[in-house]
Amino acid sequence: MKTQFAILLITLVLFQMFSQSDAILGKIWEGIKSIFGKRGLNDLSDLDELFDGEISEADVDFLREIM
């Protein structure tokens, strides 16, 4: 009886580990697909506008209004 209970517990632990690792690997794969997919690469090019070093006249006016 003790052996059967131990085997059951070990089986449950291994099954839980497998199901959690499957979910983690699935999320990692989704992230990789979103980064290297066509839409993902196009979306990354939009981030270049965020790091533009130039300040436009509208930005300067907005900063003056805030101050």
Curated annotation (Swiss-Prot):
Localization in the cell: Secreted; Target cell membrane
* GO CC term (a single one): other organism cell membrane
List UniProt keywords, sorted A-Z: Amidation, Antibiotic, Antimicrobial, Antiviral protein, Cleavage on pair of basic residues, Membrane, Secreted, Signal, Target cell membrane, Target membrane
Q: Identify the stretch annotated as signal peptide in this record.
A: 1-23
Propeptide found at 40-67
Annotated positions of the Phenylalanine amide modification: F36
Tell me, what does this protein do in biology?
Answer: Amphipathic peptide with antibacterial activities. Shows antiviral activities against the herpes simplex virus type-1. It potently inhibits the initial infection by provoking the rupture of viral envelop and the dissociation of proteins from the virions (EC(50) is 0.43 uM). It also effectively inhibits viral attachment (EC(50) is 2.87 uM), viral entry (EC(50) is 4.29 uM) and viral proliferation after infection (EC(50) is 7.86). Morever, it enters mammalian tested cells (Vero) and reduces the intracellular infectivity.
Which named protein is this?
A: Peptide Hp1036
From what organism does this protein derive?
A: Heterometrus petersii
